[in-house]
UniProtKB/Swiss-Prot annotation:
Its cofactor is Ca(2+); heme c. Catalyzes the reduction of nitrite to ammonia, consuming six electrons in the process. This is Cytochrome c-552. CDD domains: NrfA-like. It comes from Shewanella amazonensis (strain ATCC BAA-1098 / SB2B). Its main location: periplasm. The gene is nrfA.
Length: 467
């Protein structure tokens, strides 16, 4: 049956339809999300950016270090955590990870829209079209058909030009909060600020008026202590630990913050200087290499422009620093894993919230500091001394928590030491937490088979209307 439209309802329907056509008729005035649009005009940069696809190998960080499963018990990272890959894989990896779940509709799934925020130039497009409230409202799956282009040109550049920009309003606010507004920064500083839109610590706000918004916790500064004080003051927790019941903080990837504290940051050596150097192609044309990667892979164009030592010497220095960081990282993890299980035993023995509060605070602070150091993937090069300092405080605070727990458990008549489960592999650690990995993997496979093709088809149809 066809319902007859009145003149008023017909006009309204036409207006709504026209608004959708107009919205899809072109990319945003400020943001062109399609990277391919620039492959001819900026071919050298485009081709080198596309070469980030050469990092196709997937490294399972949980398999390499099963203790991580316990440290993140009750949080998405205990399900799945792989080492980062090149920019070409940003969308692929966030779609494929178990952390984003297996939504069956736009209103389904465990994660919010904010999880797209560092993955695509479609994000600034959506914010420009919908406003931040419109963009951040809803589940991650809501953006499935909208966020279709991986990290690329418009994330860092003004539309159609090489001019740098901050494309995310939350990044602009963060820079202003620490007294370094982007529009007043030098070109050298801007080359790091554009990276700091994503390679930073951030969290998703939980207040009613800004629920799910991305914010950098920099109001009091950018050190690990500054951010710890900030989070404690607003009583923020990313999740409650499944074993110890600690209100936990999950560090993201504070590369910018740790870089600022190291030799390179202190001497104003930018991210671009080391990770996107000027190179000369076969035609003798000089350009900025957009294959963001390890400086040692292009030593002469990166390290060699400042350091007089040869590559072998510099690699030895780096490996020595990394070895020290990894050794202290392992010590912190061992203390924290034990502390979580001992806290769990204390709760089972009848410990009260008042008895546990100072213990859980030590665990919270210890793991935050450990995570801050290790989640900044390049910290062994950027700021090894700061990494060792922070990890040292993590070990101390975790050890303090264990001393407190030993005393408390003794008063409860609990036999010590507390027996720990076998967590020698990722699978055993996940089983110890009662995680049904078979179901999670099956659900994800179904999502990839049924939802992803629809997202891609819808995105293709939408972009076909762009001018």
């Amino acid at each position: 049956m066809v319902k007859k439209l009145t003149g008023k309802s017909f006009a309204l329907s036409a207006l709504v339809a026209a608004s959708f056509v107009a919205a899809g008729a072109m990319a945003s005035d400020k943001t062109e999300p399609r990277n391919d649009v620039y492959k001819d005009k900026f071919s050298k940069q485009y081709n080198s950016w596309h070469a980030t696809a050469e990092s196709e190998a997937i490294t399972d960080a949980l398999e390499q270090d099963p203790a991580l499963v316990i440290l993140w018990a009750g949080y998405g990272f205990a399900k799945d955590y792989n080492a980062p890959r090149g920019h070409m894989y940003a969308l692929t990896d966030v779609r494929n990870t178990l952390r984003t779940g297996a939504p069956t509709s736009a209103e389904d799934g465990p994660m919010p829209m904010a999880c797209w925020s560092c993955k695509s130039p479609d994000v600034p497009r959506l914010i420009e079209e919908q406003g931040e409230s419109g963009y951040f409202t809803g589940k991650w799956a809501k953006g499935g058909a909208e966020v279709a282009n991986t990290i690329g040109c418009s994330d860092c550049h003004e539309k159609g030009t090489p001019k740098l920009r901050l494309s995310r309003p939350f990044a602009s606010r963060a820079m202003e909060a620490i007294g370094t507004p982007f529009d007043k920064a030098s070109k050298q500083d801007k080359e790091s600020m554009v990276c700091a839109q994503c390679h930073v610590e951030y969290y998703f706000e939980k207040t009613d008026d800004r629920k799910g918004f991305v914010k950098f916790p920099w109001d009091g500064g950018t050190t690990v202590e500054n951010m710890e004080v900030y989070y404690d003051a607003i009583q923020f927790a990313d999740w409650t630990h499944a074993v110890s019941k600690t209100p936990m903080l999950k560090a993201q990837h504070p590369g910018y913050e740790t870089w600022k504290l190291g030799t390179h940051g202190q001497n104003n050596v930018s991210c671009v200087d080391c990770h996107m150097p000027k190179v000369t192609n076969e035609q003798g044309k000089k350009f900025t290499d957009h294959k963001v990667g390890n400086p040692f892979d292009r030593f002469e164009e990166t390290c060699g422009t400042c350091h007089s030592q040869d590559k072998e010497h510099m690699l030895t220095v780096y490996k020595d620093n990394k070895s020290k960081v990894m050794e202290l990282k392992s010590k912190a993890e061992a203390q924290l894993v034990a502390a979580h299980f001992e806290a769990g035993a204390a709760w089972k023995a009848g410990a009260t919230e008042d008895e546990m509060k100072p213990i859980l605070t030590n665990i919270r602070h210890a793991q935050w500091r450990w995570d801050y150091a290790i989640a900044s993937h390049g910290v062994s090069a950027h700021a090894p001394a700061e990494a060792l300092r922070v990890l040292g405080t993590a070990v101390d605070k975790a050890a303090n928590a264990r001393v407190q727990l030993a005393q408390l458990l003794a008063t409860k008549g609990v036999k010590q030491p507390i027996e720990l489960p076998d967590i020698s592999t990722k699978a055993k650690a996940q089983a110890a937490l009662g995680m049904d990995m078979d179901k999670m993997n099956a659900d994800k496979a179904k999502f990839k088979q049924e939802m992803l093709p629809k997202w891609e088809a819808d995105a293709k149809a939408r972009e076909a209307t762009y001018k």
